[in-house]
Every structure is written in structure tokens, then in C-alpha cells.
Amino acid sequence: MMISRRKFLAFLATSLAASRSHGQGVASRNVPAQPRGKPSGIPFLARFTDITRTAGLRYPTIYGPTDHKDYIIETVGCGCAFLDYDNDGWVDVLVLSGSRVSGAPQGTSNRLYKNNRDGTFTDVTERAGLLRTGWASAVTVGDYNNDGFDDLFITSYGQNTLYRNNGDGTFSDVTKQAGLLDSQVRWGAGCSFVDYNLDGHLDLFVSNYLEFDFAHTRKPGEDSNCQWKSVPVNCGPRGLPFSRHSLYRNNGDGTFTEVSEQAGIARVAPGYGMTVVAADFDNDGWPDVYIACDSTPSLLFRNKHDGTFEEVALLCGAALSQDGMEQAGMGVGIGDVTLNGRLDIFKTHFADDTNILYLNDGQGNFEDHTIQSGLGVETRFVGWGAGIVDLDNDGNPDLFFVTGNVYPEVESKVPAYPFKTPRVIFRNLGGAKFEELLDAGPGISEVHASRGCAFGDFDNDGDVDVLIVNLNEPPSLLRNDLKGNNHWLKLKLVGSRSNRTAIGARVTCSYGKKRQAQEVIAQSSFYSCNDQRLHFGLGNAATANLDIRWPSGTKQSIANVKADQILTVREPTARSKPE
């Protein structure tokens, strides 16, 4: 009965979308916020302090001018990553950057900062060979050649770049020799390493946002897609040409082959694709791909186990809002909010709309649980980077997202829509119920025009810190000053038969009476990559039991693991429990 209802709603939504007239360039349902309930009064022990300046992350992310945005490319921004590029056990920081139409200021570049293990970082960008100026978008991290060092793939407007980690602190641009140099100018957006055919080699999925060139783009205010709140603004995405998404198969010899057509990716109706998340949503052991799409239905490519995919988002309930409307999908958080071993989806949207929480039924079908969960109380902001992460180690994953408008021109005429806005936390109360926290430290209440964010433990103290990209400012590094006695466990997985980074590995952690699933993924949030060590808050549980399903199909169980440690788990070289 549920699938029949979904098919009906999918047909209805498609019909409505075809006839719907749009009065602005970006999707927003213009819904009022739900009334706030009485606060729970439960203490929240995580407090976030911005330590960017003392940590040494000093370079701004340049992205268009500060007081106006004439082109959509100046508004979107870019991502960041926590990664351990030198394998010293301490995550380092990568922050992307863009440019300006008038030319980038001196020193503009993507920036790599090495973790000094004392709360500070050293800029090693030039030494690492990563100096690059352009309109960078997204980053994915993974060991595509299985040599033991994580590599980087960065999308941009123009050309994407594959950086091979040389294992000596430097990277080499191997885009051309890897077969990834594009003959066309594309606007590369979300991207993810994913072993879609489970051969032990990481492939690449890339979403392309839209077709764009400066010479043929309308100026602010020239048509209905170039206005917001009756203020002339940059045009799009509506009214601009779609672009197609791409899948590249790893040949196992350092090169890639585009297989978008034969895999069924190129034949899907295009949309304005943004963040890409590769994860196993239907629990069949094969990675699927979800794309948050801006002002068009989001996409879910279900892996058919034969090298092809089927796009099923409408049928599975993960394309539109509950009332069948397109939303401006930006960022995506993936996690098990209900502690039932299934991966749920949290997706951020534009102002005057709710963000959305899709609950997974275990077979890859989703129910919009936004209003029931309490998320409908917040509609003021444009949401971007997001995560389902346990911020207070109580064993219940919380929701975090960053915000920032795209139209700086609007604030002076409509003050209710400022360009710079705060970060937002929804604390998990259990039972898929959340409450917004209005005070979680100065790092949360500070206002910025933020875009990407990444979650990780840069100081290895057992909690989750946050790295945030801010337009035309240095990034924000928010240290989690967590108090209390809640326990935690952090897992670094190393593949042997599977890809070395263990992307796609699923861990189910049982602690006390709770059971939570997480998966190693290579992109989420907004255009960003988290610390790929899986972090479990354990509450008052002093031990945990682990069940690991490696991408190779190997299953591994580890019982009575002591809490409060960072544990490295290597994949058994022989399949322990054949499927």
C-alpha cells in the first residue's frame, strides 16, 4: 500500500512540477514556522568556542564581492574537509576557496593546514603542492590507488582536479593522466569517492550544478528568476540550463573511465545537483547515491548490483517535501537518528521553508518526519552544511547545520533576511523528537555567511568539533568544550580486500540498550568531507559491541570494546562470514 501511495504522489508531483509557475529563481514553499514548544530543561553539556585565530587558520575563503552578487556563481561557495593526509593520527584541515570576477586577491587559494597536535595548525599549502586559484566547489577524500595515503578530488567551475597523495607530505595533480580532464567547461558541484561495483577500487561520482557562462547570464532583476522579496538579485538557478551528472569507474591502474551512460546516470532527467552522498540506504550491501538538488526534485540512484543504477527518489519518498513541492536542497546529513540501524537523511533548504528529515524504513523508502520531529520551528535561514552527529556524547545523534543568505542586497531593504546568520543545533530528545537550542556557546550564536562544514575531532579529546567555511572570511574552527562524564568510542577502519579507506563500511554499535548504525562516507554536509573515523557517543555505557560489514562482504564482530578510546580496526584478509 505504501509503494502504491508513493507512485501516486510521484505522478502527481511530476505533473504539478511541469505546470507550476515560478516567481523567483529558487524554490521556497513560503511556509510559516511551527510554534515552539516548552523547552525540555535538560542540560546540554556541549559548548562551542571559536578558536580560529589562535589555531592559525588565517586565510579567508574568497567568493565574489561582499556587498552584492551579480552572478549565481558568486553565491554558492564551497566546502572543506577534516583529513589525516600524513597518517599521524591527527586530522588536518583543508579549506577550499573561490575567486572574484574582477580577479582574486593576492594569496587566494585552497588551503591545507597541518595539525600541530597542540591546538594549532601550520599552513602547508605551497609545500604540499596545492596552491590553486579558481572557483572551487567540493572535495571528497579517499585512497583511490590503495597505497595507504588519502587522495583528494576537488570540483570547480572550469575543471575538476584529482590530487594524488605522494606519501611524503606532497600532492601531485594527476587529472590528465587519470583520464579525468574534461573537454568542456563544467560547473562541478558535489562529488564522492564510492566503490559502486565493489571491486576494491574507489570510483568517482560527480554532480554538475548547471550550465553557466558569464557572457550569456542575465543581469540582476532582468526577469522573475532574478528577484527575491521584490529586490533585484542574481539570476537562477531556475531559468538556467541543467547539467548532467557523471560516474567514473576506477580501472585499478590509476586511470578512470566515464561510464555515466552505460550505468544509467546520464539518462536520468537532469536537476540542479549539489551535495552528493554515497551510502547504502536500502541495506543490501551495495552503495547507492543521493543528490540534494536545488529547486528541482532530489535524486536517489539505487545500485542494481550489475554496474547500473535506477533513479528512485520520487518512488521512495526522498525527492520532494511531504506536500509534493520542490525544495532548494543544499546540504545533507546522514545518520541513524532513531537508533534502529538505518541511515536517515537530513537535508537543508532555503529561507521561508523547513529543512527536511527523511526517516528510513530499512528498505530504502523514506517518510518525511519534519513536522513530527519538531524541525518545523525554524524557517528563517538559508541552510547549507549539515550533519547528524552526537555533539554531547549522550548516545543520541543530534542535528547541526550552518546558515547564510545568498543575497546581500536584500538585507538593507528587507531587514528580516540578513546575509549573515547563526549556526543551528537541534538536540535529539529520543524517539525522533528534537528541540532547537538557542544557547550552545558563542561559536553557535556568531553570524556569518557560511557554506560548507565538516565534523571531526581535531584535538583527539573524544568529542565532535566543527570546521565551517565562511564567505570572504577565514573559516571557523569550533572546539567542542564538552563537560560531563558521557563515554565515547571512535573507530578508524582500514580496508584490505575492500578499498583502503573503507568507504562504504557499515558499523553497528550496540551500547547499553541502544543500537546505532554509521557508515564511512566520502562526502556529506555541503560539499565537504568529515573526519572518516566514526564517532559514537555512548552515554553512560562503558563498553560497546561492534558489528562491521566491510564493502567486500566480510562481516566482523568485536565484543566488549572499552569506551573512551580511538580504535583502529583492520579488515580480516579472508572473508570471515560469507554472505
Regions found by a protein language model. Name each.
Residues 1-16, 22:
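N-terminal secretory signal peptides and thylakoid transit peptides that target proteins
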Residues 46-47, 65, 373, 408, ...:
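Gly/Ser/Thr/Pro-enriched helix-cap/hinge segments flanking short amphipathic alpha-helices
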Residues 93-97, 151-156, 204-208, 289-292, ...:
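Hydrophobic beta-strand segments that make up the repeating blades of beta-propeller
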Residues 99-102, 211-213, 296, 352, ...:
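Short glycine/acidic-enriched loop and turn motifs that connect beta-strands
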Residues 103-108, 157-158, 238-243, 295-296, ...:
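Short, solvent-exposed loop/turn segments at conserved positions within beta-propeller repeat blades
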Residues 110, 160-162, 245, 297-300, ...:
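Structural signal for beta-propeller blades
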